[in-house]
């Protein structure tokens, strides 16, 4: 299968996501439900962030959770990292997590977004 020259990352309305974050969270024993609730409570906050194009709170295993979020550019990613959810995560990390969150900056090669 051949791909076009860069058009793979084009989404409807010319809105593109180019960069993302993948955050892995390991809950302390007995804190799994609290981590889940934390992720659920983060959704309304990120919905108010104009540069957060996509945001997912996910469960990877019984005590392993994650966040995947995507942005049109580095400025959007930095705004999110300086925002309320990131601040709340760092404030709760010692209480809820077995180790500090693993935050990976990633590049989005291709995406399909609703629209």
Model regions: which residues?
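Glycine-rich beta-strand-turn "strand-cap" elements at beta-sheet edges
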Residues: 2-17, 26, 53-63, 89-115
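Hydrophobic core residues within well-ordered beta-strands of beta-rich domains
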Residues: 19-21
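Short hydrophobic/aromatic beta-strand micro-patches
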Residues: 24-26, 68-70
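Short, surface-exposed ligand-recognition loops at beta-strand->loop->(often short) alpha-helix junctions
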Residues: 26-35
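Short phosphate-engaging motifs
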Residues: 31, 63, 76
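Short, solvent-exposed alpha-helical surface patches in well-structured domains
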Residues: 34-37, 79
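An amphipathic, aromatic/His-enriched active-site/gating alpha helix that lines ligand/cofactor pockets
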Residues: 41-54, 70-104
């Amino acid at each position: 299968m051949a791909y076009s020259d860069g058009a793979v990352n084009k989404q409807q309305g010319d809105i593109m996501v180019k960069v993302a974050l993948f955050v892995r969270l390991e809950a302390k024993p007995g804190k799994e439900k609290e981590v889940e609730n934390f992720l659920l409570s983060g959704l309304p906050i990120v919905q108010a962030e104009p540069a957060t194009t996509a945001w997912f709170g996910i469960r990877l295993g019984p005590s392993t959770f994650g966040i995947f979020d995507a942005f049109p550019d580095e400025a959007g990613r930095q705004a999110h990292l300086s925002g309320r959810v990131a601040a709340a995560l760092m404030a709760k990390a010692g209480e809820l997590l077995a180790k500090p969150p693993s935050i990976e900056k990633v590049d989005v090669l291709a995406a399909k977004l609703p629209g």
